[in-house]
């Protein structure tokens, strides 16, 4: 893990891109995918706490469906028009990175549509 190296600088930002499926379980999503995204969110929180006193800030960004080739051809997935654009996620990452040390975002769900959970 990079944490020991970042601690030496007394400053750092770690952004993990998880998923809204790391915040809930849906029957239409693979258990393995959901499990990995839950683990990534949990690891982000553990790393955030472990690095806090060394000036390290960690954020788990949890987007909904993003308009990439990954989702093409999967039945039951939102249409391209309903998905988040990759640029939206990039802008969000840029914003989180611009925050001062005393304004830490632990996790940030980004929905592309009305969600009943999160």
Can you name each region flagged by the protein language model?
Residues 24-31:
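Active-site loop immediately N-terminal to the catalytic Tyr-X3-Lys motif
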Residues 63-73:
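Short, flexible catalytic-loop segment of classical short-chain dehydrogenase/reductase
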Residues 19:
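Residue(s) in the substrate-gating loop at a strand-loop-helix junction
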Residues 10, 23-24:
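ABC ATPase "signature
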Residues 36-37:
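Active-site helix of classical SDR
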Residues 53-56, 60, 76-118:
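C-terminal helical subdomain
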Residues 1-8, 49:
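Amphipathic alpha-helical dimer-interface segment in Rossmann-like NAD(P)H-dependent oxidoreductases
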